[in-house]
Amino acid sequence: MAQIFNFSSGPAMLPAEVLKQAQQELRDWNGLGTSVMEVSHRGKEFIQVAEEAEKDFRDLLNVPSNYKVLFCHGGGRGQFAAVPLNILGDKTTADYVDAGYWAASAIKEAKKYCTPNVFDAKVTVDGFRAVKPMSEWQLSDNAAYMHYCPNETIDGIAIDETPNFGKDVVVAADFSSTILSRPIDVSRYGVIYAGAQKNIGPAGLTIVIVREDLLGKANIACPSILDYSILNDNDSMFNTPPTFAWYLSGLVFKWLKANGGVVAMDKINQQKAELLYGVIDNSDFYRNDVAKANRSRMNVPFQLADSALDKLFLEESFAAGLHALKGHRVVGGMRASIYNAMPLEGVKALTDFMVEFERRHG
């Protein structure tokens, strides 16, 4: 079968080696004669999977010992509610920085539980969309925390700065689309959360990193399944967890460690992004309207100069094994999501196709 490269924003491409191992173990895992999907989440075999996955994840991001790692349900949208329900405490307001679609979605959900102080960080610079630097973010004095999204998948906008607002500011961040793609200083955050379906594993799992002093503050109305303290006290098994997603994510963590960890991912992700943006920037046929300082390395939206060619581009690229390139309905055009599992070979195949498509239709 011809090589297929999946540029979907999520569920996203998984490492071929991981899929091969999962396929081999699907019906007979660990010599048990059953699938990992069929074993008890409280049995010693799966407990080992869970413990190894957490250890490997901690190793990859160098998570400090005073942070808890939770394996949860609910996705990023679940965390839009979980963060205020767990972290507000006796306060009624929180700072929210709006830099795109997902930040705005978090703000909308937070309004159910608190009064968000919203700072619009979006700006236009020389005709390109950009984000104001953190030094210009206006935070309030009485906020329980500050929330932002470092990578906007739909807009193709990234905020690569590391927060430095002082020890009294609890920073909560939605890392769903950029987790494990580069090193991060976890100690600068109070809460980090990430849906698994982009850089971690299959959909159905959400990972939360929470500083332990923030536990025990949950609103009385917080559903138990979203309560960080309850999840922590029950080793993320307050109810039956998504065991297969947990197992596969653990395999991805081992794949990452075997391939140089987040430092190596950082390097290759930069190479992939430079290759794709280079073709776009050196062409009048393609365009990207995000300022270079805020371009995402994970999600690259681009438009054709003649939108009438969009349908043909998508049809021909799909036939060439380049799948899921249609842009989000909010922005249109094309979008290539190039997460950790997307090899440089896949991006090279895309750029070769783009050059040839321009030659024939430009």
From Swiss-Prot:
CDD domains for this protein: PSAT_like
Highest taxon, organism lineage: Bacteria
Catalytic activity: O-phospho-L-serine + 2-oxoglutarate = 3-phosphooxypyruvate + L-glutamate; 4-(phosphooxy)-L-threonine + 2-oxoglutarate = (R)-3-hydroxy-2-oxo-4-phosphooxybutanoate + L-glutamate
Entry's cofactor comment: Binds 1 pyridoxal phosphate per subunit.
Pathway(s) served: Amino-acid biosynthesis; L-serine biosynthesis; L-serine from 3-phospho-D-glycerate: step 2/3; Cofactor biosynthesis; pyridoxine 5'-phosphate biosynthesis; pyridoxine 5'-phosphate from D-erythrose 4-phosphate: step 3/5
GO molecular function: O-phospho-L-serine:2-oxoglutarate aminotransferase activity; pyridoxal phosphate binding
Localization of this protein: Cytoplasm
Annotated binding of L-glutamate, by residue: 9, 42
Protein name from the UniProt record: Phosphoserine aminotransferase
Upper classification of the organism: Bacteria, Pseudomonadati, Pseudomonadota, Gammaproteobacteria, Enterobacterales
Gene designation per UniProt: serC
